[in-house]
Swiss-Prot record:
Species of origin: Xenopus laevis
Amino acid composition bias (Low complexity), ranges on this chain: 309-325
One of the record's GO cellular component terms: ciliary basal body
Function: Casein kinases are operationally defined by their preferential utilization of acidic proteins such as caseins as substrates. It can phosphorylate a large number of proteins. Participates in Wnt signaling. May play a role in segregating chromosomes during mitosis. May play a role in keratin cytoskeleton disassembly. Phosphorylates protein custos.
Protein name: Casein kinase I isoform alpha
Occurrences of domain Protein kinase (ranges): 17-285
Length: 337
């Protein structure tokens, strides 16, 4: 966005949402913290220039409307045009899983990974029940809620989502093999790399890579160098295809390899058995004698930070509050989390 944040000091959208400060950015534009001047409530505002080459905010707002009411789907307050922007006003959420992973020194315990997996499978399943696939499953697009929703995981960013079947007839989109890669190469399914039309199986496979990213700290195809983006994607694809699932998941419970092998074995139109996948991880969770108490790795760190802050000055409190990295497209905000 060309204009400075200073010029938005008195920018009010939708008649009552006053922009406070920028809290994130992405390929589409910027995300701002805003306040509802009628009741003081904090919200998130997504701004997209009306001159954007590939506008997606209107499409995304329509998708959020279709998904409204689902657990872990942010509530949309307003969509419209203001000055030279398309504007989407929605719930303010907490940090992304990428932010939290960094905050936890890029280490998650098995307990945290399994509690997240349970919610992540359910969020993707809900989107699929509404006849859409997400097509950009990655840690940056899962955000924790704030306040009373601080243990609830939210799925965001539906700009790349696609309808995979007709609402009425349930007719599935046709199989094709001439597609460009949509989404993030690091977490893309093998079929997406091969140019095959994405379907439900691809969202689920991507989630498998996200879980292994959390387990391992990084994936074998990260950090590959190439002259062009196209060549880099090819290298990632080659490495992904040449890394057996058993090698990727070596040293971790067999359930992760079972999950990925199951997803890779799904047919194009086949509905994933979400309950089976949740149960895989739930049974493992119980076997490891964990308690489903919503105590995530960052819960402990936050408590320590709060205790340290309480024993130091007000300024110290500011310093101790984790801010996380403002990742691309992330509505990250640790305040009130």
């Amino acid at each position: 966005m060309a204009s400075s944040s200073g010029s938005k000091a008195e920018f009010i959208v939708g008649g009552k949402y006053k922009l406070v400060r920028k809290i994130g950015s992405g390929s589409f534009g910027d995300i701002y913290l805003a306040i509802n001047i009628t009741n003081g409530e904090e919200v998130a505002v997504k701004l997209e220039s009306q001159k954007a080459r590939h506008p997606q905010l209107l499409y995304e707002s329509k998708l959020y409307k279709i998904l409204q009411g689902g657990v872990g789907i942010p509530h949309i307050r307003w969509y419209g045009q203001e000055k030279d922007y398309n504007v989407l006003v929605m719930d303010l959420l907490g940090p992304s899983l990428e932010d939290l992973f960094n905050f936890c020194s890029r280490r998650f315990t098995m307990k945290t990974v399994l509690m997240l997996a349970d919610q992540m499978i359910s969020r993707i399943e809900y989107v699929h029940t509404k006849n859409f696939i997400h097509r950009d499953i990655k840690p940056d697009n899962f955000l924790m809620g704030i306040g009373r929703h601080c243990n609830k995981l939210f799925l965001i960013d539906f700009g790349l989502a696609k309808k995979y079947r007709d609402n009425r007839t349930r007719q599935h989109i046709p199989y094709r093999e001439d597609k460009n890669l949509t989404g993030t190469a690091r977490y893309a399914s093998i079929n997406a790399h091969l140019g095959i039309e994405q379907s439900r199986r691809d969202d689920m496979e991507s989630l498998g890579y996200v879980l292994m990213y959390f387990n391992r700290t990084s994936l074998p195809w990260q950090g590959l160098k190439a002259a062009t983006k196209k060549q880099k994607y090819e290298k990632i694809s080659e490495k992904k295809m040449s890394t057996p699932v058993e090698v990727l998941c070596k040293g971790f419970p067999a359930e992760f390899a079972m999950y990925l092998n199951y997803c890779r074995g799904l047919r194009f139109e086949e509905a994933p058995d979400y309950m089976y996948l949740r149960q895989l991880f739930r049974i493992l969770f119980r076997t490891l004698n964990h308690q489903y108490d919503y105590t995530f790795d960052w819960t402990m760190l936050k408590q320590k930070a709060a205790q340290q802050a309480a024993s130091s000055s007000g300024q110290g409190q500011q310093a101790q509050t984790p801010t996380g990295k403002q990742t691309d497209k992330s509505k990250s905000n640790m305040k009130g989390f």
